[in-house]
């Protein structure tokens, strides 16, 4: 059965890692719904958050392949229920419509959004919430023909359990393994 899975990968912050990761999705013909890459709590380690709809069997195989990428330190997959997830969306509304319609003000209050910019041409409204809430607010603004532009972030996540200890242990294990088999670090290549 197809459902949404969120893959979280911690990698060394190196050129080409994003390409290698997304290439595996392409090979398995998995459409990426959301992709976010940011610095993790450990300096020099990036955190990839990739959301896609697929089967459990396919995501199992994909994660096994992701673990084989040399720069990947740790990778796991989760369902939405296992993580704290949020997205940020920006909605642009024409100022004239905003002034003439009490509907926009009601929608902003109802969806617990906030106005972050207002000028003579347009108003920008920000909403932080679940994907479902962001989509519902967008749908309501579109139905009222109020929305002129829309954008959203990728899924931002936090684990319900701490992952730093496990990540640090995996990083140390990887560095030790590379030292034991004689791999040079990227830093030593550059000297």
Descriptions of predicted regions:
Residues 1-47, 53-191:
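Long, contiguous binding/interaction regions
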């Amino acid at each position: 059965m197809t459902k949404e899975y969120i893959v979280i990968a911690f990698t060394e912050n190196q050129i080409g890692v994003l390409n290698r990761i997304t290439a595996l999705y392409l090979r398995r013909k998995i459409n990426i719904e959301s992709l976010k890459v940011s610095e993790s709590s450990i300096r020099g380690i990036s955190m990839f958050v990739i959301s896609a709809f697929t089967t459990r069997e396919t995501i199992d195989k994909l994660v096994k392949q992701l673990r084989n990428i040399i720069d990947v330190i740790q990778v796991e997959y989760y369902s939405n229920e296992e993580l704290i997830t949020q997205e940020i969306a920006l909605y642009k509304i024409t100022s004239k419509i905003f002034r003439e319609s009490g509907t926009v003000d009601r929608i902003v209050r109802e969806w617990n959004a906030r106005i972050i910019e207002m000028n003579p041409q347009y108003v920008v409204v920000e909403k932080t919430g679940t994907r479902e809430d962001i989509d519902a607010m967008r749908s309501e603004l579109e139905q009222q023909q109020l929305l002129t532009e829309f954008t959203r972030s990728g899924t931002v996540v936090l684990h319900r359990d701490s992952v730093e200890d496990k990540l640090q242990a995996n990083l140390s294990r990887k560095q030790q393994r590379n030292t034991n088999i004689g791999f040079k670090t990227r830093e030593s290549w550059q000297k």
